[in-house]
């Protein structure tokens, strides 16, 4: 399944993996998964975290290594994001609920994820998604960005 991913997708997933793998040991534990989920405004129980890991933990060691992570991401991409998942993701970024993601909101979420971005990088991310050029990302633009991957 992971063999259907492009080089670029694999590189992006490698970056995402290292955001989860806080101690850099090459595996994601339930604790690390929980930290990331909570920084995204989710509140999974210990059992839910364990279930998420067990779903893809091919070698049964209780953690997710990079090949297992790739399998999980490939699977997730196959059941392409439902409208509801995309709306939920938009709400995570749209902190003030005004229907737009501003540069400040994007920076806030990325910083919570442990991703330190320069102002230029944040502005570039906004520009890439900002179709109407108003300097922020509305829901339609967000959907286009999420589904054009």
Swiss-Prot record:
Task: Give any Gene Ontology cellular component.
Answer: myosin II complex
Among PROSITE patterns, the record links this protein to: EF_HAND_1, EF_HAND_2
GO molecular function terms listed in the Swiss-Prot or TrEMBL record: calcium ion binding
Residues annotated as binding Ca(2+) 4 are 130, 132, 134, 136, 141
* Hydrolase found in the keyword field: no
Q: Which residues bind Ca(2+) 3?
A: 94, 96, 98, 105
Residues annotated as carrying N6,N6,N6-trimethyllysine in the record are: 116
Which residues are Ca(2+) 2-binding? 57, 59, 61, 63, 68
Indicate what this protein is called per its UniProt record. Calmodulin
| Species whose genome carries this gene | Renilla reniformis
């Amino acid at each position: 399944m992971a063999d259907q991913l492009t080089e670029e997708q694999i590189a992006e997933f490698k970056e995402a993996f290292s955001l989860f793998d806080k101690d850099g040991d090459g595996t994601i534990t339930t604790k690390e998964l929980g930290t990331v989920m909570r920084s995204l405004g989710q509140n999974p129980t210990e059992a839910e975290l364990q279930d998420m890991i067990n779903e893809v933990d091919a070698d049964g060691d209780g953690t997710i290594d990079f090949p297992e992570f790739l399998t999980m991401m490939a699977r997730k991409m196959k059941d392409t994001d439902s409208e509801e998942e995309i709306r939920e993701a938009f709400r995570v970024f749209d902190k003030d609920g005004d229907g737009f993601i501003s540069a400040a909101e994007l920076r806030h979420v990325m910083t919570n994820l442990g991703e330190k971005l320069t102002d230029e990088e944040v502005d570039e991310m906004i520009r890439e998604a900002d179709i109407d050029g108003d300097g922020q990302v509305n829901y339609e633009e967000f959907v286009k960005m999420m589904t054009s991957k």
